[in-house]
Amino acid sequence: MKRTIIALACVALAGPALAQSLGEKTGVNSALGVAPSTADFVKQVAISDMFEIESSKLAQQKGNAQEKSFAQQMVTDHNKTSTELKGLVNDSKVQATLPTALDSSHQSKLDKLKSATGKDFSSDYNSYQVSAHEEAVSLFERYAKGGDNAALKDWAGKTLPALKHHLDMAKNLGKAPSVGQSK
């Protein structure tokens, strides 16, 4: 009887911790506007930065002129945010573990980009950039409003304008100006 009660107590207490990670992973937190846990935020930001950098390095090789220009800025800016995030974690201002590799979802997108060429590459790269930046803006907005680590919350708020600018730029990839129009 005691073992059953102890087991049930462990399951009940583990629920909220598991729910936060599961909620972020499944998009439930985003849909509800709930701030991610610090560990989830750090993990998602690090993976997003790795994907942005690696996919944009491919775009620098395979993309059109507009994509190459955008990709250069993505590599520069996301290297900067990666360095800043690592600094926060390494300075012990944030208690979290940085991932060292992409998750399976981002890795499969990167693999698809590696094998794509021409218009297929452009279509996939442009689409991935929009969705990645929409997710990043949501993630940073939610953490900046409701995150539980002051240093990371402040950093998220300061980084958000650049991510919104990236999203606007990504939405314009592949949209050439009409005749007589300048961009």
Regions found by a protein language model. Give the residues of each.
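N-terminal signal peptide c-region/cleavage motif recognized by signal peptidases
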Residues: A9, A14-P16
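His/Met- and acidic-residue-enriched segments that coordinate or traffic transition-metal cofactors
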Residues: K2-I6, L18-K183
